[in-house]
Amino acid sequence: MLTEEATDILINHLTDKCPDIIIHYYHSYTSNSIYIKLDYGAANSIRISDHDKSDNGYNYKYELRTDKTLSWHRFENDIYKIMYPATQIEQLANKIIKEREKKMNEKGQSYLNELNKRKNYMDSEKSKKFYKLCTELER
């Protein structure tokens, strides 16, 4: 399965089950990787690829790999990371939605405040490269 196909399937699962989720994505120019931020990053981020990542300094909670068959989880750079193979896209979508709902329920208004803060940052001149190059999914 290609990374683009895996991305389309994942996005369809996420938007079908959670229509209000905000999705930004970026397809790398230098590799076959696609990067997604959910709710401006407030609901974490995903790297979809067919290869091990280079040490680019970015950290993604979720990773979807088209070249792997087994899932794993580990702590790396103080972040609990979870990798799913492309055969488990629906499980990944369910995990993301469950964790997003948990954050929203626990944080309440502060989750929305964080989302708005991140949106304002994205729109600012100080925003990082991802936000300058990414595309927001239109529904």
Show the residue positions of the predicted features:
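Negatively charged, low-complexity tracts enriched in Asp/Glu with abundant Ser/Thr
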Residues: M1-G41, K107-E138
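Intrinsically disordered, low-complexity regulatory segments enriched in Ser/Thr/Pro
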Residues: G41-K98
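Sequence-pattern detector for short linear motifs
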Residues: D50, L64, K68, K103, ...
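Charged, low-complexity eukaryotic segments
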Residues: I79-S124
